[in-house]
Amino acid sequence: MEDGVLKEGFLVKRGHIVHNWKARWFILRQNTLVYYKLEGGRRVTPPKGRILLDGCTITCPCLEYENRPLLIKLKTQTSTEYFLEACSREERDAWAFEITGAIHAGQPGKVQQLHSLRNSFKLPPHISLHRIVDKMHDSNTGIRSSPNMEQGSTYKKTFLGSSLVDWLISNSFTASRLEAVTLASMLMEENFLRPVGVRSMGAIRSGDLAEQFLDDSTALYTFAESYKKKISPKEEISLSTVELSGTVVKQGYLAKQGHKRKNWKVRRFVLRKDPAFLHYYDPSKEENRPVGGFSLRGSLVSALEDNGVPTGVKGNVQGNLFKVITKDDTHYYIQASSKAERAEWIEAIKKLT
């Protein structure tokens, strides 16, 4: 990483004039967040834009876009709004932490205050659990329930543990994720919520009160009164649901060479096990459906040379490249943002081939 760089990587940014979404390479420094367009695996200079962080306000989680739950919102002193989407909750929170630190760099006490997690949480006297549940049911601003898959079974009208934590913070019921977990646990204890599926039920059985509600994107919950028996996987099944039913092992933004036009585009890659699949999504699209993917059984993965353009790669694309050859001899050329990231992806994929 260059001197003075606090964090860098891909984020998906909403356009100012036309509200489309495009992947950009962001570099965070002490007082600015700069973003670049990428062409042929390289960032195009000069930068596409620069966000001055002095006087900025940050909203995270930001739930203004229903189909984009991993957003950070920045509002500058001139009231310009930026919406930035990360590839995972962990990555979103890491960006938010660093950006918040950069905004308040001159006030160390403020940074400490912003990131301190309180060990105890008491519900404010003017807010009742009934009121929170009523707001959760609101058709416009409430928590969104939908069918979710876990280990091959579909559960109707459920939501993710991490989504409820985001919602509680966004609606100002709590100030931190730790407080939100405590509040969600209270909702379960009072029988407003019920765990659904192996992951969340397992946490209940563990007996550890501190970890009964999981701030996790694989743990499912539902309103107690809407609990339904799980649908048999035989009733609702297709090839894609089988492929997507595995446990997420790793996810992130990577550049990929197209099969027909050979152009390079940033995609959000999701690696799953049991069954082992690597899917990729178009981050500019609203729907959360993969645009491609393949089984890793019998696949080969290897790093490509960093000196010069490797065979099979179109254009002047060099550095941090790796290749996956599937069982049916389809070649996928992928570029990571650093050697370390490439090594992590290769190691994770190799374990599943």
From Swiss-Prot:
Alphabetical list of InterPro entries matching this protein: DEP_dom (IPR000591), PH-like_dom_sf (IPR011993), PH_domain (IPR001849), Pleckstrin (IPR037370), PLEK2_DEP (IPR037369), WH-like_DNA-bd_sf (IPR036388), WH_DNA-bd_sf (IPR036390)
Gene3D superfamilies found in the cross-reference section: Pleckstrin-homology domain (PH domain)/Phosphotyrosine-binding domain (PTB), Winged helix-like DNA-binding domain superfamily/Winged helix DNA-binding domain
A Pfam entry, by short name: PH
GO cellular component: cytoplasm; cytoskeleton; lamellipodium membrane; plasma membrane
Domain DEP: 139-225
Primary localisation category: membrane
TM ranges: none
Modification Phosphoserine occurs at: 120
Localization, UniProt: Cell projection, Lamellipodium membrane; Cytoplasm, Cytoskeleton
Annotated GO MF terms: phosphatidylinositol-3,4-bisphosphate binding; phosphatidylinositol-3,5-bisphosphate binding; phosphatidylinositol-3-phosphate binding
SUPFAM superfamilies, sorted: PH domain-like, Winged helix' DNA-binding domain
Membrane-protein topology: Peripheral membrane protein
UniProt keyword terms in alphabetical order: Acetylation, Cell membrane, Cell projection, Cytoplasm, Cytoskeleton, Membrane, Phosphoprotein, Repeat
UniProt record, GO biological process: actin cytoskeleton organization; intracellular signal transduction; positive regulation of plasma membrane bounded cell projection assembly
Occurrences of domain PH (ranges): 4-104, 247-353
Residues modified to N-acetylmethionine: 1
CDD domains assigned to the protein according to its UniProt record, in alphabetical order: DEP_PLEK2 (cd04444), PH1_Pleckstrin_2 (cd13301), PH2_Pleckstrin_2 (cd13302)
PANTHER family: PLECKSTRIN, PLECKSTRIN-2
Free-text function comment from the UniProt entry: May help orchestrate cytoskeletal arrangement. Contribute to lamellipodia formation.
Protein name: Pleckstrin-2
